[in-house]
Amino acid sequence: MSVKLNALTSDSYIDVSQYRDQHFKGNRYDQEKLLKQSHTLYVGNLSFYTTEEQVHELFSKSGDVKRIIIGLDKVKKTACGFCFVEYYTRAGAENAMRFINGTRLDDRIIRADWDAGFKEGRQYGRGKSGGQVRDEYRQDYDPARGGYGKLAQQHRPTEAIRNTF
Protein backbone atom coordinates (compact mmCIF):
# COMPACT_ATOMS: atom_id res chain seq x y z
CA MET A 1 0.00 0.00 0.00
CA SER A 2 2.72 2.49 0.86
CA VAL A 3 4.31 1.99 -2.56
CA LYS A 4 1.09 3.13 -4.21
CA LEU A 5 0.89 6.16 -1.93
CA ASN A 6 4.45 7.09 -2.78
CA ALA A 7 3.60 6.89 -6.47
CA LEU A 8 0.61 9.14 -5.91
CA THR A 9 2.67 11.70 -4.01
CA SER A 10 5.68 11.66 -6.33
CA ASP A 11 6.29 14.92 -8.14
CA SER A 12 7.53 14.07 -11.62
CA TYR A 13 7.81 17.77 -12.52
CA ILE A 14 10.71 18.25 -10.15
CA ASP A 15 12.45 14.95 -10.85
CA VAL A 16 15.75 15.18 -12.67
CA SER A 17 15.26 14.25 -16.34
CA GLN A 18 17.43 11.92 -18.42
CA TYR A 19 19.00 14.84 -20.33
CA ARG A 20 22.61 15.61 -19.43
CA ASP A 21 24.79 18.45 -20.65
CA GLN A 22 27.46 16.68 -22.71
CA HIS A 23 29.91 19.53 -22.06
CA PHE A 24 29.66 19.24 -18.26
CA LYS A 25 33.11 19.31 -16.64
CA GLY A 26 33.05 16.48 -14.12
CA ASN A 27 31.70 12.99 -13.71
CA ARG A 28 28.11 11.77 -13.90
CA TYR A 29 27.78 11.50 -10.10
CA ASP A 30 28.85 15.14 -9.60
CA GLN A 31 26.43 16.28 -12.28
CA GLU A 32 23.52 14.34 -10.68
CA LYS A 33 24.32 15.86 -7.30
CA LEU A 34 24.38 19.39 -8.70
CA LEU A 35 21.12 18.86 -10.59
CA LYS A 36 19.36 17.68 -7.42
CA GLN A 37 20.48 20.82 -5.53
CA SER A 38 20.27 23.30 -8.40
CA HIS A 39 18.44 26.63 -8.37
CA THR A 40 18.94 26.99 -12.14
CA LEU A 41 16.63 26.01 -15.00
CA TYR A 42 17.33 25.70 -18.70
CA VAL A 43 14.32 27.02 -20.64
CA GLY A 44 13.94 26.04 -24.29
CA ASN A 45 11.65 26.59 -27.27
CA LEU A 46 11.55 30.35 -26.77
CA SER A 47 10.77 32.64 -29.66
CA PHE A 48 13.84 34.49 -30.94
CA TYR A 49 11.85 37.63 -30.12
CA THR A 50 11.05 36.82 -26.48
CA THR A 51 12.64 39.41 -24.20
CA GLU A 52 14.34 39.04 -20.85
CA GLU A 53 11.50 41.12 -19.36
CA GLN A 54 8.89 38.63 -20.62
CA VAL A 55 10.83 35.70 -19.15
CA HIS A 56 11.22 37.54 -15.84
CA GLU A 57 7.53 38.43 -15.67
CA LEU A 58 6.50 34.79 -16.09
CA PHE A 59 9.15 33.03 -14.02
CA SER A 60 9.03 35.48 -11.10
CA LYS A 61 5.51 34.19 -10.40
CA SER A 62 7.06 31.03 -8.94
CA GLY A 63 9.78 32.62 -6.81
CA ASP A 64 12.41 35.35 -6.59
CA VAL A 65 14.53 35.30 -9.74
CA LYS A 66 18.23 35.98 -9.21
CA ARG A 67 19.10 36.44 -12.88
CA ILE A 68 18.16 35.48 -16.42
CA ILE A 69 20.72 34.69 -19.10
CA ILE A 70 19.30 34.84 -22.62
CA GLY A 71 20.90 32.36 -25.04
CA LEU A 72 22.70 34.00 -27.95
CA ASP A 73 23.75 32.96 -31.42
CA LYS A 74 27.55 32.81 -31.03
CA VAL A 75 28.11 34.43 -34.42
CA LYS A 76 25.36 37.08 -34.63
CA LYS A 77 25.02 37.70 -30.84
CA THR A 78 21.22 37.69 -31.22
CA ALA A 79 18.71 35.67 -29.18
CA CYS A 80 18.46 32.06 -30.36
CA GLY A 81 15.55 30.54 -28.44
CA PHE A 82 16.72 29.50 -24.97
CA CYS A 83 17.69 30.96 -21.63
CA PHE A 84 18.79 30.09 -18.12
CA VAL A 85 16.71 31.20 -15.14
CA GLU A 86 18.46 31.28 -11.76
CA TYR A 87 16.41 31.46 -8.58
CA TYR A 88 17.54 32.42 -5.10
CA THR A 89 16.03 29.19 -3.73
CA ARG A 90 15.46 25.62 -4.86
CA ALA A 91 11.79 26.05 -3.92
CA GLY A 92 11.35 28.83 -6.50
CA ALA A 93 12.88 26.65 -9.21
CA GLU A 94 10.73 23.67 -8.16
CA ASN A 95 7.60 25.81 -8.40
CA ALA A 96 8.60 26.85 -11.92
CA MET A 97 9.06 23.21 -12.89
CA ARG A 98 5.63 22.36 -11.46
CA PHE A 99 3.60 25.29 -12.72
CA ILE A 100 5.43 26.99 -15.62
CA ASN A 101 7.11 24.15 -17.52
CA GLY A 102 4.92 23.33 -20.54
CA THR A 103 3.00 26.62 -20.49
CA ARG A 104 2.91 29.29 -23.19
CA LEU A 105 5.19 32.29 -23.43
CA ASP A 106 5.06 34.54 -26.48
CA ASP A 107 2.68 32.06 -28.20
CA ARG A 108 5.11 29.13 -27.78
CA ILE A 109 4.96 26.13 -25.47
CA ILE A 110 8.15 26.38 -23.46
CA ARG A 111 9.98 23.56 -21.75
CA ALA A 112 12.10 23.82 -18.64
CA ASP A 113 14.66 21.39 -17.30
CA TRP A 114 17.10 21.36 -14.43
CA ASP A 115 20.54 22.76 -15.12
CA ALA A 116 23.65 22.04 -13.04
CA GLY A 117 24.42 25.77 -12.91
CA PHE A 118 25.28 28.42 -15.46
CA LYS A 119 28.92 28.79 -16.47
CA GLU A 120 30.23 31.61 -18.64
CA GLY A 121 30.16 30.66 -22.32
CA ARG A 122 27.06 28.48 -22.05
CA GLN A 123 24.88 31.39 -23.17
CA TYR A 124 26.01 30.74 -26.74
CA GLY A 125 24.33 28.31 -29.13
CA ARG A 126 26.30 25.16 -29.91
CA GLY A 127 25.16 24.70 -33.50
CA LYS A 128 27.67 24.88 -36.37
CA SER A 129 26.12 28.12 -37.63
CA GLY A 130 26.08 29.73 -34.17
CA GLY A 131 22.50 29.02 -33.04
CA GLN A 132 21.01 25.97 -31.40
CA VAL A 133 21.73 22.51 -32.75
CA ARG A 134 17.99 21.73 -33.00
CA ASP A 135 17.53 24.70 -35.35
CA GLU A 136 20.25 23.47 -37.69
CA TYR A 137 18.16 20.52 -38.89
CA ARG A 138 14.60 21.84 -38.64
CA GLN A 139 12.77 21.48 -42.00
CA ASP A 140 9.60 23.37 -41.12
CA TYR A 141 9.12 27.11 -41.40
CA ASP A 142 8.94 28.73 -37.96
CA PRO A 143 8.92 32.55 -38.11
CA ALA A 144 9.44 32.84 -34.34
CA ARG A 145 12.69 30.85 -34.64
CA GLY A 146 14.21 32.51 -37.71
CA GLY A 147 12.26 30.84 -40.53
CA TYR A 148 13.58 27.54 -41.89
CA GLY A 149 16.39 25.63 -40.16
CA LYS A 150 19.91 26.73 -41.08
CA LEU A 151 20.64 23.71 -43.28
CA ALA A 152 17.23 23.93 -44.96
CA GLN A 153 17.89 27.63 -45.70
CA GLN A 154 21.15 26.72 -47.45
CA HIS A 155 19.36 24.26 -49.77
CA ARG A 156 16.25 26.36 -50.50
CA PRO A 157 17.77 28.71 -53.15
CA THR A 158 19.06 25.72 -55.16
CA GLU A 159 15.68 23.98 -54.95
CA ALA A 160 13.88 27.14 -56.03
CA ILE A 161 16.09 27.51 -59.12
CA ARG A 162 15.68 23.80 -59.99
CA ASN A 163 11.90 24.04 -59.69
CA THR A 164 11.66 26.96 -62.14
CA PHE A 165 12.88 24.91 -65.14
Swiss-Prot record:
Residue ranges of every copy of the RRM domain listed in the record: 39-117
Ranges in coiled-coil conformation: none
Signal sequence range: none
Subcellular localization(s) per the UniProt record: Nucleus; Cytoplasm
Entry's Gene Ontology molecular function annotations: mRNA binding; RNA 7-methylguanosine cap binding; snRNA binding
One GO CC annotation: nucleus
GO biological processes: mRNA cis splicing, via spliceosome; mRNA transport; nuclear-transcribed mRNA catabolic process, nonsense-mediated decay; positive regulation of RNA export from nucleus; regulation of translation; regulatory ncRNA-mediated gene silencing; RNA splicing; snRNA export from nucleus
Residues where mRNA binds: Y19, Y42, R111, A112, D113, W114, D115, R122, Q123, Y124, G125, R126, Q132, V133
Pfam families given in the database record: RRM_1 (PF00076)
Matching PANTHER family: 20 KD NUCLEAR CAP BINDING PROTEIN, NUCLEAR CAP-BINDING PROTEIN SUBUNIT 2
Quaternary state and interactors: Component of the nuclear cap-binding complex (CBC), a heterodimer composed of ncbp1/cbp80 and ncbp2/cbp20 that interacts with m7GpppG-capped RNA.
Protein name: Nuclear cap-binding protein subunit 2
Organism: Siniperca chuatsi (Mandarin fish)
